[in-house]
Every structure is written in structure tokens, then in C-alpha cells.
Amino acid sequence: MDDLKYIKKILRNRIKYKIIINKKNIGVGRSRNIGIQKSNSKYIAFCDADDLWHKKKTQLQLEIMKKNKLSFTHSSYNLINSKNKIIGKMRVKKFLEYKDLIKSCDIALSSVIIKRSLLKKSLNFGHTKTKEDYLLWLKLSKITKIYGINKTLLSWRKTDNSLSSDVSQKFYDAYKVYKNIENKNVLTTIFLVLRLSIFYLIKKITQKLSNVFY
């Protein structure tokens, strides 16, 4: 059974849904923007094809958002491999600001739920190959609180052949984000990319060390 048929099967009689098929490959950023534009829901949630939501993720997350009048939340998550084995854990801070995100970003896209009213034409996913979500989080951090829920509500799959695993592409896109979109000068951009690289290496080392305990 192909993925589309499987999705239709599990969603049948459960929720209202609409499947949008692009006529050509336009990239993940543009595809998400189209989905947001066609949505009429109050909230938008994301789930990449290889990630796993925990059973009560949306229920728990929306309860917290409504109770605390929040517009943007994300959660802690497990990192898993292609065999669903836990290879790391990521715990999130309660609040993130722009000054935090410009240094490093551990927000898992598939853990995010956001109010659709925040996502306007000027505030949508970028068109880079890997940092399209990071770019949007930077923009949104200037106008709303980013609230981290310290509960593991997602299993984020780490695969060697995914775009997010392409380190050189990551740093190239980070350079474009800082230089061309965040309008940083060349020296500041180089400094920010170097700092991002250091945080990335520290995180990778920490994850490798933590694997001993799983």
C-alpha cells in the first residue's frame, strides 16, 4: 500500500481532511505555505512523513495553549533511528526569544502547533532547502512568545539521507538566512554561522554520549 492510500485509510471516518497534490516538486517550504493558505482551522500543526506524534500530542498541546492563551508551542522529543530505536532525547526551554534562536534552534517542526492567524503572507516558510522552518521561527519570535512544553510528545526520526542531515547544506542555508534575510553584515554572519556550528557539534557529541544509556 502506498503512503497516500494508507493515510486515507487511517483517517477515514475520523477527521475531516483535504489532500493537496502539487503538479510538480515545489519544495517543502512552498508546499507548507499552500497548505496553510488553504486551511480554515484556528490552529496549524505539522508532521513530517518520517516523524511520529505521540498518541495524545494534539489534545495535550491544545489544552495548554488555550489555558495559557498561547499562539506558538513546541515540545520536547525523542530522536529515533530508522528502526524506531531511541538514540537521543531533546528537552526544551520554557520560553525562547529571538536572542536565543539566533544562536541555536532545537525546535522540531513536527512538535509545533501555531495559531493560523500568525501566518500571513510576510510570515511564512522560506524557500531554502533546509532552514525554511528556522527562518519562520526567527520571524515569529519577534512578534510572539515561543513556549516550550517539557513533555515528550514527538519522536523525531534521524536518517542519514534526509535533507536535514546534510550538514554542508544546513550551514549554507544558515548563511543565507543570516546574511540576506536577517540582514546581518558579513562579519556578523560568519560569526553566527561559526557559533551555530559549535552548538551543532556540542549537540552531536552530547547525543552520542547519551546513546550509551539507551
Where are these regions (language model features)?
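Short aromatic/hydrophobic "clamp" motif used to bind/position activated sugar donors
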Residues: 44
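Conserved donor sugar-nucleotide recognition element shared by glycan-biosynthetic enzymes
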Residues: 3, 28, 32, 57
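The conserved acidic donor/metal-binding loop of glycosyltransferases
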Residues: 48-52, 76
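Non-catalytic, C-terminal membrane-associated alpha-helical segments of glycosyltransferases
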Residues: 161-214
